[in-house]
Amino acid sequence: MRIAVPIWQGKISPVLDAASRLLVIDLEDQKESSRFEIYLDEQDLSRRCFRIQGLGVNTLICGAVSRPFMRMLNASGIEIIPGISGPTEDVLRTYLHGSLHHSGFTMPGFKGPRVKGGDS
């Protein structure tokens, strides 16, 4: 499984659409096996989506994301976990323990999880 997290100054980037760096983590048996970082220099959302899809990302954990970009990513088969904020390593550790939605990492004002297949 491959997850990705947009990062900024050691934290989850506040807005996926404008993020310039993406941390990509490979998981085997719910444990990290490798990681690498890429720069997202594509400004066009469809190109940005194509780039993320080309990385083989299964799940993307992010802060805010526009509805059009979320729909593009969902249509590409990528599960989106939006509305998350906090230090990157803490968020990843909590995700790997399966308790991300029950943690204190939800962005202020976020109305609830909108995951793959969501229409909101």
Each predicted region: which residue ranges?
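Non-catalytic interface/targeting segments
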Residues: 1-47, 51-55, 74-75, 80-120
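Short acidic/polar active-site loop segments enriched in Thr and Asp
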Residues: 58
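Conserved SAM-binding loop
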Residues: 61-62, 80
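Conserved short alpha-helix immediately C-terminal to the canonical SAM/SAH-binding motif I
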Residues: 69
